[in-house]
Structure formats: structure tokens, C-alpha cells
């Protein structure tokens, strides 16, 4: 236990692995531990989409969308082998939103993030592409693109890159306890080993509250609120 790491990360999901990659790439000494395998839980159960958040434009959250689109482009650039543009179709009916508003929103979505290698949005002939499926009022639509990615592979690649920069990646190593002793974090693993670190990061995903209270023994007035999304998948 002689070595003191700059950073110890609990959790090997995309957040933990991403932090490890970034920190190790900046020259910090990093150790990451996960109770299972890297990317083996929530980060492999996602929608597998990297998107800019088109719907946030209606709430005038332009800064958020711009940042998300820039990050989408970065991910697509560095992980092109495991990602691809995927089209989305918005059926148009004049009683829902005016066409000019949708066009404006998609124009902003195409350009807010700066130069992009992802296809631009365009109008779409619904009747020609999907005859006898949609109601008569849905004749025209709009097509835009986001990125679909292998989420688990992305997480593993982040961890591998961190490891190449001398980060220590510990799979199947559950953190039993973490406590501050003489201004340093002492992390006890379930296998009996102890690790020292200057900084501790709790990136345990949906187990973050449990880890905070049971393993780190810190009482917090605020709790992380979990969010779940659902997608309906049908045959073509």
C-alpha cells in the first residue's frame, strides 16, 4: 500500500472509464475498481445513441445542445469503427407544429455543433417510403441523423486507453470500504487489499447512493435521482 494514487474511481461504467482515460491521459496516477467487468452493467443497457438532444431546442437550451453536438462529433471521430449515423424520421402534420419551426429546429441541430461529418437533415416523402402504413394526413416528414454506437465496447476502449497510460484497472474487485485516514483516502477491497488515494470518485451509477452510505459512510442530504427511458421496437 506504499503507492498513493492521485485518483481512485469506484465504478467501471462509461463515466468511470471516461474519467480514468481523461485523467491518465493528463499524467495523473489512476486506479479504477469495479465489482464486475468493465461496461458490464448500465453502460451496456443504454439506448446506444450519442445524440445532441433535439427536443431541448424547444426549451431554448442552445448551450446544452451545442455542447452535446460537439461531444457527439468527437465520439464519432475517435470511435468511428464502432459507431454509425442512424436516421430518424419525424412525421409532419400541420396541427402539431408548423413546418417552418421543424425546419428551423433541424437547421440549428445540423449547425450548432460546428463542422460535422454526420449527414444533414432533409425533407422526406412518407407516402413513397411507407405506403399504406401511416394515416393519410402524414404525407411529408423530416429526416435527421444521430449516432448509434456499441456502448459496452466504447466503455472498454476508454478503460483500455486509460490502461495504456498506466492506469490500474481492477475488474471483479468490489470496494468494501473507503475512509479518510491522515488526509488520504484508504480504500479497502473485498479481496483484502488496501489502496491509498488523494481523491476518491464515486462513479457507481445506479448504486451511487448505496456506495455513498454503505461503503464510504458519508451522509448526504441530496440523493441521485435515477432516470429510465424506454424505446418501442417494431418489425420493419
Set out the residue ranges of the language-model regions.
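Glycine-rich FAD pyrophosphate-binding loop
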Residues: 24-45
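Central beta-strand plus flanking loop segment that forms part of the substrate or channel wall
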Residues: 50, 219-236
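Core beta-strand elements of the Rossmann-like FAD/NAD(P) dinucleotide-binding domain
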Residues: 3-5, 190-199
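Beta1/beta-strand and adjacent pyrophosphate-binding region of the FAD-binding site
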Residues: 2-15
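Flavin (FAD/FMN) cofactor-binding and adjacent substrate-gating region
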Residues: 92-171, 177-183
